[in-house]
Curated annotation (Swiss-Prot):
Pfam families: LRR_1 (PF00560), LRR_2 (PF07723), LRR_8 (PF13855), LRRNT_2 (PF08263). SUPFAM superfamilies: L domain-like (SSF52058). The keyword Electron transport does not apply. Residues 919-948 are cytoplasmic. It is found in: Cell membrane. Glycans are attached at residues 99, 113, 183, 328, 381, 392, 436, 465, 608, 653, 679, 688, 789, 837, 842. It is a single-pass type I membrane protein. This is Receptor-like protein 45. Belongs to the RLP family. The chain crosses the membrane at residues 898-918. Coiled coil: none annotated. It comes from Arabidopsis thaliana.
Length: 948
């Protein structure tokens, strides 16, 4: 070939390549216009300024194939992939609907990603519900993390070319949508996790999905026995995920048909019985999780020895009756595992096959009965180990290898370790991100090397015997630390000796130690703090105003020695939901205004606060505890806190009447106004409160903000097996448990209520006030109240017969009042009644007998001299005892008013003594004879004493 021809060929080749490359950058004009219309629509319904599509897809750019989120065919220049995932934005309000007509120009579209778009539905202006059928090449459709419900399912049934359908994290509910997906016979991957599907799986209809290779139904509400459901007809399955549902019964024998199964996740159900032998036939199995079920009997690890592809094995049982044995495992497994979890398996020793495992990344042997010295060899054999969980066992002495550069998670909590930490622990575990040593008996100081753990994010040393000062550079060296809990130790000295604004600390929990000094200003450097708990220490000084500069969610400084006024800035922290300053020596008044509407719990009891209670507290307030202060004035109307549930105002100086406006608080479950000076009558409208007939259903719900009860920490590990749906992830969920306690007098003692028990408690305490008038009949409508205390007032009239409707009542105290009449016999119907006290009233008649009333002693009826029958010693003698009706028209005069009786006795005594003194003042023979008699008596006494 001549050089000229060769040059011509080269130029032709270059020109063709340039044309081809240019074609890759351009696209069909109709599709470019379609993309611009999609952009305009999204911007119109989602106004988030951070939406990245605003900065791309420019109308001036004609080469749409290189736009972000767009993929084109390299030869035809047609758009084959569109991704509109908007996961980084805030959800719009209101939620928009998506117009499907925008996608019809893309006739060659193969993949459409609409995940995290915050859409609630679809509409189709041109083709009704059949529009997706025009996208004949569409194989992958991702609708995950939206607000879709079953209204979009009919649209999906037209997309007959689909091979992958992802619907996770939506609002779908009802049964498995087999009819809506009946035409999708080519479907290979179906992801329905994190929805609200329920009921049993269909039996016959699933055969229409016979090509399914991966099915994920986890985190729904499917139920029933797997033996009666049609899932076994899907014999082509390679992945089956059914975790976190309500399936029950044994693993069905038909599962043995899944010869191609690589992933099987049945965790967190109610499966029971023995684990079947046929799991040894799953020769392709890579991932097998049977965690958190009710399995029992013996399980031989020999069943997994032949699974040569196995990488992940997880097993635990809630029944406590599962026992692992090592038969036919003498030479170890034929596979090298990446993750092994054997929790709640009654293991008394570490399985021997682990000696032969050298590629483990995750080891979980928690919640067993393992004991002895810490198994250092697990770390030495598996140099790539990332997570070791041995919590809830009985290990003792802790020893560590020289180095563990890969270990990220170490949980040794709830064991019996009783030695000091190695001085170089921070250097050995230099890569550690998560350390939990809580609930042991570790001694001594925190080693200074722990201040050099640059990667540590979570550290829990609570409930040990650590002492001494914290390392000086703890908060500067551990600059990745976001969660620190040191509760219930004997640490002393200042809280923070040195800090840096580079520290990312979010949660600081240091309660129940011996820290001293003032609240340090070095806290200001920890600008990301959202949780501070310094309660039960020895802190002094005042509460600094600058604490109000943090974006705190929780602030607890209770039970210290703090003085001075409460800074008003604390009441204006935007997202503060718990403020606990109780048990100090704080003084001054409460701030009149608060700009935060997020506060849930305000606990200021056991201080020296004065002034009135403002009616402008947090709008979202649920719990208000101001007990044992010196507050005065009237009870506030709580107009600005309509959701309040618990109001504790006992032992203050409150006066006036109980406001009728309280009856509008439909969520109240506890009212404690005892030991004040409230007067007038009890309003009859209290029946509108939530523990009465007018209560709302949400009184039963947990009134804590659910999103604030826990701190969820996820640590993603490497992918250990191949998955068609999602890779495995290792996560830890540690509660930030603040144990908010409510103290309420029940059954003649103070009980503590928190969380679950708090939601079940309903009580009203108006004792030790100056209330008068009759007890309202309407109080009998408080059908859910468990404790009612009206003692030590001046209430009159009779005991309402309507009290027989208090079917949940456990404690009823009406003592020290002016009640008269008989005890209603209907009260014997109160089967939950444990404490009943009507002592020191003017009651009369026969004491009712039967059921709970047979358990009450005489103390329940003292001071009622006209009551007769058991348990008093007064017999009714067959005579008709006055019922006291003749006194009902005159509440001020009982037959034997105790007060009048004592006044009469006192007057008589004073009169006699005064008469005797007057008698002695006159000089008369009688007076002289009296003194002679007294002198003679004194002489006789002296003589007797002298003889003795």
């Amino acid at each position: 070939m001549s050089s000229s021809k060769l040059m011509d060929f080269g130029l032709t080749w270059i020109i063709m390549m340039m044309i081809l490359l240019q074609g890759c950058r351009s696209c069909i004009e109709s599709e470019r216009q379609g993309l611009l219309e999609i952009k305009a629509y999204i911007i119109s319904v989602i106004t988030d300024p951070h939406l990245d599509i605003r900065r791309g897809w420019m109308s001036s750019d004609r080469s749409c194939c290189h736009w972000r989120r767009i993929k084109c065919d390299i030869t035809s220049k047609r758009v084959i992939g569109i991704s509109l995932s908007l996961e980084s934005i805030r959800p719009p309000d209101p939620l928009p609907q998506l117009n499907l007509t925008f996608f019809y120009p893309f006739e060659e579209l193969q993949s459409l990603n609409l995940s995290s778009g915050y859409f609630k539905g679809w509409f189709d202006e041109r083709k009704g519900g059949k529009g997706l059928g025009s996208l004949r090449n569409l194989e992958t459709l991702d609708l995950g993390v939206n607000f879709y419900d079953t209204s979009v399912l009919p649209y999906l049934n037209e997309a007959v070319s689909l091979k992958t359908l992802i619907l996770h994290d939506n609002l779908f509910k009802g049964g498995f949508p087999v009819q809506e997906l009946i035409n999708l016979t080519s479907l290979e991957v179906l992801d329905l996790k994190f929805n609200k599907f329920s009921g049993q799986l269909p039996t016959q209809e699933l055969t229409n999905l016979r090509n399914l290779r991966a099915l994920d139904l986890s985190n729904n509400k499917f139920s029933g026995s797997l033996q009666k459901q049609g899932i076994c007809r899907l014999e082509q399955l390679q992945e089956l995920r059914l975790s976190r549902n309500r399936f029950e019964g044994e693993i069905p024998l038909c599962f043995s048909r899944f010869s191609k199964l690589r992933v099987l996740d049945l965790s967190s159900n109610h499966l029971s019985g023995k684990i079947p032998y046929f799991i040894s036939d799953f020769k392709s199995m890579e991932y097998l999780s049977l965690l958190d079920n009710d399995f029992e009997g013996l399980f031989s690890l020999g069943l997994i020895t032949e699974l040569t592809e196995l990488k992940v094995f997880k097993l635990s049982s809630r029944s406590g009756m599962l026992q692992i044995v090592e038969t036919n495992v003498s030479g170890g497994l034929q596979s090298q595992l990446s993750s092994i979890m054997l929790s709640h398996c009654n293991l008394g020793k570490i399985p021997g096959f682990l000696w032969y495992q050298q590629e483990l990344r995750v080891i979980d042997l928690s919640n067993n009965i393992l004991s002895g010295v810490f198994p250092t060899w697990l770390l030495e054999n598996n140099t790539e180990l990332q997570a070791l969980l041995l919590q809830n066992n009985s290990f003792k002495t802790l020893t560590l290898p020289r180095t563990m550069r890969r270990l990220q998670i170490l949980d040794l909590s709830v064991n019996n370790f009783n030695n000091q930490l190695p001085k170089d622990v921070g250097l050995i575990l230099a890569s550690l991100r998560h350390l939990n040593l809580s609930n042991n008996e570790f001694l001594g100081n925190m080693p200074s090397s722990m201040a050099r753990m640059e990667n540590i994010e979570f550290m829990d040393l609570s409930y040990n015997n650590f002492s001494g000062k914290l390392p000086r550079n703890l908060f500067t060296g551990c600059y990745s630390l976001s969660w620190l809990k040191l509760s219930h130790n004997r640490f002393s000295g200042p809280i923070i000796r040195k800090s840096s604004d580079e520290t990312s600390l979010i949660t600081l929990i240091m309660d129940n130690n011996m820290f001293t000094g003032k609240i340090p200003r070095t806290l200001l450097n920890l600008r990301m703090l959202s949780v501070i708990d310094l309660s039960n220490n020895l802190l002094t000084g005042t509460i600094p105003r600058w604490l109000g500069n943090f974006f705190l969610e929780v602030l607890r400084i209770s039970n210290n020695r703090l003085q001075g006024a409460i800074p008003p800035s604390l009441f204006n922290i935007p997202y503060l939901w718990l403020l606990d300053l109780s048990g100090n020596f704080l003084s001054g008044s409460l701030p009149l205004r608060s700009s935060s509407d997020y506060g849930y719990i305000l606990d200021l009891h056991n201080n020296n606060l004065t002034g009135s209670i403002p009616d402008t507290l947090w709008y979202g307030l649920r719990l208000l505890d101001l007990r044992n202060n010196k507050l005065s004035g009237n009870i506030p109307l709580f107009r600005s806190t309509p959701s309040i549930s618990v109001v504790l105002l006992r032992e203050n100086n409150l006066t006036g009447k109980i406001p009728v406006e309280l009856c509008g608080l439909s969520n109240v479950r506890m009212l404690d106004f005892a030991h004040n000076r409230l007067n007038e009558s009890i309003p009859s409208c209290v029946t509108n409160l939530s523990f009465g007939s007018g209560g709302h259903s949400n009184a039963d719900s947990d009134w804590y903000p659910a999103s604030l009860l826990s701190n969820f920490m996820e640590i993603y590990t490497e992918v250990y097996y191949e998955s068609l749906i999602v890779s495995d992830r290792f996560s830890l969920d540690y509660s930030v448990d603040f144990n908010v306690q409510v103290e309420f007098a029940v059954k003649q003692r103070y009980d503590l209520y928190m969380r679950g028990t708090l939601n079940q408690m309903f009580g009203l305490d108006l004792s030790s006030n100056e209330l008068s008038g009759n007890i309202p009949e309407e109080l009998g409508d408080l059908k859910r109240v468990r404790s009612l205390n009206l003692s030590r007032n001046s209430l009159s009239g009779s005991i309402p017969g309507s009290f027989s409707n208090l079917r949940s009542i456990e404690s009823l105290d009406l003592s020290f009042n002016k009640l008269h009449g008989t005890i209603p016999s209907q009260l014997t119907l109160l089967q939950s009644l444990v404490v009943f006290n009507v002592s020191y009233n003017n009651l009369s008649g026969v004491i009712p007998q039967g059921k709970q009333f047979n358990t009450f002693g005489e103390k329940s009826y003292l001071g009622n001299f006209l009551l007769c029958g058991s348990p008093t010693k007064r017999s009714c003698g067959g005579t008709t005892i006055s019922s006291g009706k003749e006194y009902e028209d005159d509440d001020e005069s009982g037959l034997l008013d105790i007060v009048v009786l004592w006044w009469s006795l006192g007057t008589t005594y004073v009169t006699v003594m005064m008469g005797f003194l007057v008698f002695l003042c006159f000089d008369s023979p009688w007076r002289r004879a009296w003194f002679c008699l007294v002198d003679t008596f004194i002489d006789r006494v002296k003589d007797v004493l002298g003889v003795i």
